Amino acid sequence: MKCKDLIKHTFTITNSTERFPKKYRFTLVNRIQEKAVDIYEMTLEANELDLRQADEHRQRQRLQAKALTYCKELLFFIELSQEMGFISMKSCEYWSKLALEVKYMIAAWKKRDLSLIHISEPTRHSLIS
């Protein structure tokens, strides 16, 4: 749910031409929207992998790490949007909070996976639903 909430909020804010002028549509806005969707895609792909298989576990760790990197990149774009005057400080704080919640959940999930690699059942996480 958290990823979905982040994507919905990201699209709601960035689709407003009152906030983000059209001249930034194909530069900043598209990158912001793509990062939010990329976070979801990485978590979904990682969640589909089986921890019982070593190669899938390694791939899952890589996807989780990539999702964390995308969270950091999205946070940068959110901050940049505020600094450029496209969003208020209050909007920046709320949007950042959503992104940070996702980031912390992915980090905790990644850490938990490291301690669960020896169990026989694959771990599924509700972050992406």
Language-model-derived ranges and their functions:
Residues M1-L116, S120:
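Amphipathic alpha-helical assembly/interaction segments
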Residues I117-S129:
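Single conserved hydrophobic/aromatic residue that forms the stacking wall/gate
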